[in-house]
Amino acid sequence: MPKATIIGLGRSGIAAARVLKGDNWEVTLSDRSNSPNLQQTQGQLQQEGITVKLGDSFTLNPEDLPNLIVVSPGVPWDIPVLVEARDQGIDTIGELELAWRYLNGCSWVGITGTNGKTTTTALIAAIFKAAGLNAPACGNIGYAACELALTQQSYDWIIAEISSYQIESSATLSPKIGIWTTFTPDHLERHKTLDNYYQIKASLLSRCRRQIFNGDDPYLHNIGLSQWKDSYWTSVKGKEALLCDPSKGIYLQDNWIVAFGELIAPINLFKMVGEHNQQNLLMAVGAARLADINKDAIAEAMATFSGVPHRLELIRTIAGVDYINDSKATNYDAAQVGLSSVEAPVILIAGGQAKKGDDTEWIKLIKAKVATVLLIGEAASTFAQRLQESDYYAYEIVETMENAVERSASLATDKGVKIVLLSPACASFDQYQSFEHRGDHFRELCLQL
């Protein structure tokens, strides 16, 4: 019986373990944590015949080497034990690659990019569902990919949101349609350089049979003709802005969506705010037309799609003030997009665990649109200093989300502001388990006002 080790006892790791166990592998799950929740999961899995080692930093035992190592998305690909395993010729892959090995009999759409992945993935899944297709979303959204392999259903398509971390560990993953939404500096603490980050993303697209690119993204537009000239391109700026022949373009013209020369639907059917969401929609429409989905299904999904939690999500309106949750804005570019999508003046809640990147354009937009910035988390003092250096002084360090929401309500009344926006420009791990946890807390506090 072949042996497999799974590193990481999260949702992805558990699904991977069950897939392999069901295929007659001897499976061991390893996780450094030893929390009560994991201990409960350990008991459940061990009843299924899966060995679980908690409080365990996986090492290679020369006397008992696994045939396969599967890593969860959060495990760095370059930690010494994984480098050593690959050097020894041990098959070392990510959970998404494992799912691909079991599910490559059906067609995949793979969506990657710095920002916009989740909304684009959700839009594609909604359009494919409206067309009557069995096309679940997975990866960073919806199911863990291996959970789909467990069901043994027959899928028409799989719609996979794929992070750079997952691409690193998925060397043969080759979707039929690949989409690249945006590209800006992010995850450089892991990938070191912008070029490394680009090459990882590009490796996935190069394996896809057809590629769709966001032609309105400055970086992708700049390298487009030199590296991706035979691909499909989108633009919200009209036919003249396309990087390809209009027969391979998806674009807005006179408030209509046009795909490959065909009128699809009027853009006013689509209710999500922001030009960036129109960009996401065009890529989704391109994928749908490449999958031969008709215009009626596209129009139906456009009209009924309400958005994704934590991405410019309207929580409630109190006394004319909109409270908007954009917790997914974990870097400067995403926060800039969020702020540009709402009307001034704004009370902005920002801060958390800072990331590397250029904050210049974000701060310019703050100066133009924000009445007061409320700063929370580890980055509060750093952000305060950056705002001072830019001659912006309308900020307060409030430290916690509870303080921020309470203060935002009084400031909105005092200053006649109609928008309170949580768009942190930071990771969440200083105070929260995830950006979802942070956004859920913001929602809970707003609903208590």
UniProtKB/Swiss-Prot annotation:
Its main location: cytoplasm. It comes from Gloeothece citriformis (strain PCC 7424) (Cyanothece sp. (strain PCC 7424)). SUPFAM superfamilies: MurCD N-terminal domain, MurD-like peptide ligases, catalytic domain, MurD-like peptide ligases, peptide-binding domain. PANTHER family: UDP-N-ACETYLMURAMOYLALANINE--D-GLUTAMATE LIGASE. Belongs to the MurCDEF family. NCBIfam families: murD (TIGR01087). InterPro entries: Mur-like_cat_sf, Mur_ligase_C, Mur_ligase_C_dom_sf, Mur_ligase_cen, MurD. It holds the Pfam family MurD-like_N. This is UDP-N-acetylmuramoylalanine--D-glutamate ligase. Its EC number is 6.3.2.9. It is found in: Cytoplasm. Coiled coil: none annotated.
